[in-house]
Amino acid sequence: MTDTATDMVPLLEVKGLGVEFQTRGGTAHVLEDIQLHIQRGETLGLVGESGCGKSITALALMRLIPQPPGRITSGQILFDGQDLLQLPEAQMRRVRGNRISMIFQEPMTSLNPAYSVGDQITESVRLHQGLNAKDGLARAVEMLEAVGIPDALRRVHEYPHQFSGGMRQRVMIAMALACQPDILIADEPTTALDVTVQAQIFDLIRDLRERSGTAVLLITHDMGAVAEMTNRVAVMYAGRMVEEGPTDVVLSNPCHPYTQGLIACAPGRSPQSHGQPLQEIPGTVPSLLERQGGCTFADRCSQAQPRCRTTVPPSTWVQSGHRVMCWLYPEGNQHA
């Protein structure tokens, strides 16, 4: 296979992923027919409002869906040509935290208060790379220095409560990158951090990606972060993917009515928004317990047609690399 052909094969490809949870009220269809891919060395943004399924998608990729009450009901997660859903758990543990790592959403609570940050960083490299205690500690110091923590040789022995929120997030990034993963999943990596620290964390992720070639899945609701950090963006609504494409194309020419509304709601994202009242998307997100046929956004969409409420729209390519699930677009370029 040529280098060009190899570059065209996605590092990660998700096909038809479905996830459901059993609740007291019934079955919640949390993810339905999720399709996405990530190329080597690129950053894909995954956006949508709270509860749309972004974090569940990340947990599914890591095979960390709690069972019960949740379960993966359908689909494939192809990583480097291998379906992760078919791997025995022992083999999946060799991938998780090693070749695919994750920065979890809450830096203030994601670290174990009973162990030093050095112990928590060295755990993964000793497990996956077979380093002894001395070499593992040296790697921990190296990673703390790489993420910009000063006096790393001393601080590697300190505990999470001795670090600020921004520094804890840097520790989380150091842990995630310690094994030099192929993919880094960053789930709202700047949650609860002030604006200055947010910018530092994004700069750090971008710099580490450029130096190591790691692909990044950036989960966020911040359209500014998407514009600054990502090559492509995928938009989710109520457990379904509604639009995907190059970031500059989607932000400048959004096709799905939900994407249009999401961008219009972001202060300053739309040129027409300056000096105008903030816009909102009318209505509420549909219950995941009451799935019906059709587009999940139909009841909130000003452009809805009768078939929008009865038939799920196909995935249609509106131009190269840009697809949308909406009946407003011709059906001639449907994705097989």
Where does each model-flagged region fall?
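Short catalytic/signature loops enriched in Gly
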Residues: D7-P10, T27, P150-R154, E244-A336
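A short, proline-enriched helix->beta-strand linker immediately N-terminal to the Walker B motif
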Residues: A178-D182
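P-loop NTP-binding/switch modules centered on Walker-like glycine-rich loops
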Residues: E49, I185-P189, L193-Q276
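Conserved ABC ATPase "signature" region
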Residues: Q82-D83, D135-R154, I263-A264
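Conserved ABC transporter NBD signature motif
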Residues: I72-D83
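ABC ATPase NBD coupling module
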Residues: L84-S101, D119, L127, V249-P254, ...
